[in-house]
Amino acid sequence: MLYLTKIRNAESEFTGNEQKIADFLRANVSELKSVSSRKMAKQLGISQSSIVKFAQKLGAQGFTELRMALIGEYSASREKTNATALHLHSSITSDDSLEVIARKLNREKELALEQTCALFDYARLQKIIEVISKAPFIQITGLGGSALVGRDLSFKLMKIGYRVACEADTHVQATVSQALKKGDVQIAISYSGSKKEIVLCAEAARKQGATVIAITSLADSPLRRLAHFTLDTVSGETEWRSSSMSTRTAQNSVTDLLFVGLVQLNDVESLKMIQRSSELTQRLK
């Protein structure tokens, strides 16, 4: 569980006191060994119970667990930084050579994968895979780079026998959404979770009784609130990566895991279909 990442991504939903706690923890993460909830409460002018509730909101049992986890994350981060002569977590600049850019991009994608995988609730993921496996029909929605991730997932699911619709046109996406039925699944892919087209489709799907699964960020959003299930992704995009490269990396890690999980549920038949698909496409060469 990456608590520093959760704190950063959940800022939009913090109350005033929660924001005080978050700011203190991030500013003093290197000194947390000597910080108690009592000392922290006194310094911030809030109650100890507020600090405990904040820790529980992030998924920890209490402040002690959160504090120890943050200390561990900080130490691990320092070790990774010291292991490389280049500060590969830093932003790409116009002065960087192609070699440096390549290393920074690679590190950014590695971080997106590490942080996304650290957030997985595998029991929930297994439940999601089971829900998808029973769906008579699956719709996948997304815009821009997220649409590309969705299209890739749709091809993989069709290859193992699922009925899937993944249309790029937003009007068609909306039309398909309103025709979904109970038992059907809509997989909505949106890092921001606030794109009106995707939210509209999710609303329509829920109204029809379909199950909505959102692949989105940790931040509070309309899509996150609409979804029956969420799969969290983490990405550190900057102005130099406007095409959402690390976001797609994180999203692809989630969709690939869904695909492999679905193959495992019916491995013999799935592998037969994958083999038949490969044989057919070979004949087209």
Curated annotation (Swiss-Prot):
Domain SIS: 128-268
DNA-binding region: 37-56
Swiss-Prot/TrEMBL keywords: Carbohydrate metabolism, DNA-binding, Repressor, Transcription, Transcription regulation
SUPFAM superfamilies noted in UniProt: Homeodomain-like (SSF46689), SIS domain (SSF53697)
Domain HTH rpiR-type positions: 1-77
Function according to Swiss-Prot or TrEMBL: Represses the expression of the murPQ operon involved in the uptake and degradation of N-acetylmuramic acid (MurNAc). Binds to two adjacent inverted repeats within the operator region. MurNAc 6-phosphate, the substrate of MurQ, is the specific inducer that weakens binding of MurR to the operator.
InterPro entries: Homeodomain-like_sf, HTH_RpiR, RpiR-like, RpiR-like_SIS, SIS_dom, SIS_dom_sf, Tscrpt_reg_HTH_MurR, WH-like_DNA-bd_sf
Gene3D superfamilies for the chain: Glucose-6-phosphate isomerase like protein, domain 1, Winged helix-like DNA-binding domain superfamily/Winged helix DNA-binding domain
Keyword field contains Transcription regulation: yes
Gene Ontology biological process terms from the UniProt entry: carbohydrate derivative metabolic process; N-acetylmuramic acid catabolic process; negative regulation of DNA-templated transcription; regulation of carbohydrate catabolic process
GO MF entry, a single one: carbohydrate derivative binding
Pathway participation: Amino-sugar metabolism; N-acetylmuramate degradation [regulation]
Classification via HAMAP family: HTH_type_MurR (MF_02108)
Subunit details: Homotetramer.
Membrane spanning stretches: none
Taxonomic superkingdom: Bacteria
Annotated protein name in UniProt: HTH-type transcriptional regulator MurR
